[in-house]
Structure formats: structure tokens, C-alpha cells
């Protein structure tokens, strides 16, 4: 039986189509390494719809440059009209799902403070293919937050960023959540998902804001205040993180071996800068 499953699964390989969706708004001024995040997502998708919600800080101009450089990137401009930040993400995602992602088999959502590790590309695609063949609708993945690599006492929860495309899926009410129309929302952390049946994945997804716990370039406190208002405990953890620095005895900042190479050039910067060499990759 297992051999038949494997043969059937492999017959689907290279046939599935995957669309990426990425909602952004003023991420340049928010100090998000969004260029690196987008680039590391491209190997997983056939197309990546990056939506700008009406940025006024130069984010859109950079996205337009990326669209010209990487054919997989398609920039959309769905304005963020609602007052609550999570509602604006939901509104943009809902529009992308309804209008841009038609015809693709699976969807991957990535945000400007997240990344998939390059060493997990093959495993991620294989897991999507297996989930597709076995009839699952989503991968519920662990995500690590707050303390990052150097501190292993991380706060973790499991949410969904990879799911089978369906006209019944909605992203509404609670912050980049995905659920089938008519089903209740099962909340975990401050994000809700409900796309049964779900596959319990072990492929870790990471927060960029936790990438360099020894680096002032990524201001974790700002992230908490902007995206986790009313979550005082989480905000306190981020404040603690911001005050913590890990340095080698020589004074040089250590780059943890698990940090993908594309992010190495950011370590030690006081402010996030879009590096021109990335457009030459």
C-alpha cells in the first residue's frame, strides 16, 4: 500500500501549480528585510503576487523594480482602506485569492517578517505534493517567535501559510486567517485558521524579526507595538529581546549558522537598506 501511495504521489510531482501571495504596506520604513523575504520565497512558487496597500515610504517603487527583475513577481495595488491593520491584510488577501490566484493548485502566503529556509525548499515542495495526493487542504506549521536562534526558550504556535486553493476559502476576521466559508474559526495565538483536513507539518517557518537577536537593525519593539497591540505579554518579550545583545569576545557580531546567507549582509547595520547586489543575483 505504501509503495502505491509513493507511486501515486510521485505521479503528481512537477504538475502542481503554486501561487504565492504577499501583502505589504510601508515595510521599508518599518525596517523589514522584505526584499530578502520575497527572494527566498520565489523558488517555491510559480508566481508571487505582491500587493502594496498604498505605501508612502518607497516600498512600491522597490517592488516595481523587483517585478522587472524577477518574472515570477507580479505587483498589485489593493489599497488598505480599513482602520485595523489585521483587517487590511485580510482585505488584500481576500482580493488576491478571489481575483489573482484562480487556477493555481496551492497557495503560499509570505509576509515581510517571515521566510522559508532555502535548505527546506525540497522538503516543503515534497510535503505539498504528498498533502495534495493524500487529500489534505493545508499544512499547519510550527512558527518560532520572540527569542530566535540564540535563545531556544521560544514561544511557538502552529498556523497556516500553505493551503490548497479553493473558491470556498476566505481570509477574514482576525488577521491573515484562512478558513472555509461557513466554518467556525479555530483561533491559536492571535491568528485563526480552519481548513480541515489539515496536515500536521514539522517544517519550521521563521520570523525575520527574530533572525538577528544581537543586531540593532531589526527593531523588535517596533514590530510588537505595530503588529501585536493589546498583546502585552508578547510586547514585553520583544522589549526584552531588543535589550539583549550577543557578541563574540572580540566584539564582532556572531552570525548563527542557521541564518540563510542572503541575510548575512544585513548583520551590523543600524538601518535596513535595500542592497543593490541583490538585483544582480
Regions found by a protein language model. Give the residues of each.
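Non-catalytic membrane-proximal stalk/linker segments that position and tether the catalytic domains
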Residues: 1-13
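Catalytic-site signature of metal-activated, phosphate-bearing donor transferases
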Residues: 8, 87-94, 115-281
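Active-site-proximal specificity loops/subdomain of glycosyltransferases
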Residues: 12, 18-21, 25, 58-109
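Hydrophobic targeting segments
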Residues: 16-22, 41, 46-51
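Short, well-formed alpha-helical segments that are part of the catalytic scaffolds
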Residues: 27-44
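Short beta-strand/loop segment that forms part of the nucleotide-sugar
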Residues: 46-54, 76-80
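Active-site acidic Asp-centered loop
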Residues: 53, 110-111
Amino acid at each position: 500500500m505504501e509503495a502505491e501511495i509513493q507511486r501515486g504521489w510521485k505521479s503528481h510531482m512537477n504538475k502542481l501549480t503554486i501561487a504565492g501571495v504577499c501583502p505589504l504596506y510601508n515595510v521599508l520604513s518599518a525596517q523589514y528585510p522584505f526584499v530578502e523575504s520575497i527572494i527566498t520565497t520565489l523558488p517555491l512558487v510559480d508566481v508571487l503576487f505582491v500587493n502594496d496597500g498604498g505605501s508612502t515610504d518607497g516600498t512600491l517603487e522597490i517592488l516595481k523594480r523587483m517585478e522587472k527583475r524577477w518574472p515570477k513577481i507580479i505587483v498589485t495595488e489593493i489599497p488598505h482602506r480599513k482602520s485595523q491593520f489585521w483587517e487590511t491584510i485580510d482585505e488584500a488577501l481576500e482580493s488576491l485569492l478571489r481575483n489573482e490566484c484562480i487556477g493555481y493548485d496551492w497557495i503560499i502566503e509570505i509576509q515581510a517578517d517571515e521566510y522559508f529556509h532555502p535548505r527546506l525548499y525540497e522538503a516543503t515542495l515534497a510535503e505539498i505534493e504528498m498533502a495534495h495526493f493524500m487529500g489534505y487542504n493545508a499544512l499547519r506549521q510550527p512558527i518560532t517567535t520572540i527569542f530566535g536562534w540564540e535563545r531556544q526558550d521560544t514561544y511557538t504556535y502552529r498556523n497556516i501559510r500553505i493551503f490548497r486553493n479553493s473558491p470556498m476559502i476566505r481570509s477574514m476576521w482576525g488577521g491573515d486567517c484562512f478558513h472555509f466559508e461557513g466554518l467556525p474559526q479555530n483561533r491559536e495565538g492571535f491568528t485563526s485558521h480552519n481548513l480541515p483536513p489539515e496536515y500536521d507539518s514539522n517544517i519550521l517557518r521563521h520570523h525575520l524579526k527574530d533572525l538577528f537577536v544581537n543586531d540593532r537593525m531589526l527593531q523588535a519593539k517596533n514590530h510588537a507595538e505595530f503588529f501585536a497591540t493589546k498583546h502585552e505579554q508578547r510586547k514585553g518579550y520583544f522589549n526584552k529581546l531588543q535589550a539583549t545583545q550577543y557578541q563574540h569576545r572580540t566584539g564582532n557580531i556572531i552570525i548563527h549558522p542557521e541564518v540563510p546567507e542572503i541575510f548575512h549582509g544585513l548583520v551590523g547595520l543600524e538601518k535596513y537598506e535595500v542592497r543593490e547586489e541583490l538585483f544582480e543575483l
